[in-house]
Amino acid sequence: MTLLKSYYELCKPNVVYMMLICAFVGMLLAEESVKSFSYLLVALTGIAFCAASAAAINQVIDRKTDASMTRTDQRPLPQGELSVTHASIFALTIGILGATILFLYVNILTMALTLASLIGYAFIYTVYLKRATPQNIVIGGLAGAAPPLLGWASITNSIDPYALLLVLIIFVWTPPHFWALAIYRKDEYAKESIPMLPVTHGVVFTKLQIVLYLSLIHISEPTRQEAISYAVFCL
């Protein structure tokens, strides 16, 4: 793996791409005058840099745990392709760059929300929640559900109830997604003393929670004019 690719993988690109798609949908659904393509690109770039920074910080903090788990042992830090110092400097640099872009060319609200999401995932979830409670992904999932709100705020410079609805959809979907993975990797999480729900409450209970959370998605279904927007977002 080349050095450039190592830094690229440090950013968890697939996760960042999905976040950008959700942010872009938030932009499209915002009820404001259409912004130029260049503006959208700049806003998405700022969000992308901050998301990549959060992912890199997560890998720096979790490097020892990653090295002992099959799912993550091929990441750049466990493989020794990057030093902790270089990875940390890289994460800090792109985080500052992303925040600066949002501050100068988008708006302060989007910058603040994006930084809150970064801190929520990289520090509150990774450092504390992940190892503190089996509800880690329920609480920490809010940071990962933020992209539609970030995209919406970049267009309207406001927090709209419809944007929060989009956040709610992802927020409710996130725990079942991670719990399904945790069931598959249950033994690895147990070995690292990470209290994922299947480890602390068993597989049967976790499957029940998955069903219950998926059923909650119906609560976030919109009515009337919002139905089309909801369908577009889900697609």
Regions found by a protein language model. Name each.
Residues I217-L235:
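Single conserved hydrophobic/aromatic residue that forms the stacking wall/gate
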Residues E32-K35, G141-A182, K186-D187, V203-V204, ...:
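Functional transmembrane core segments of multi-pass inner-membrane proteins
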Residues I61-L82, W179-T206:
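Cytosolic, membrane-interface loops and tails of multi-pass inner-membrane proteins
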Residues T2-V15, P76-A87, I124-A143, M196-L208:
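Interhelical loop and helix-boundary elements at the membrane-water interface
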Residues I21-V25, L29-R63, R71, A112, ...:
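Membrane-embedded alpha-helical segments that form the functional core of polytopic membrane enzymes
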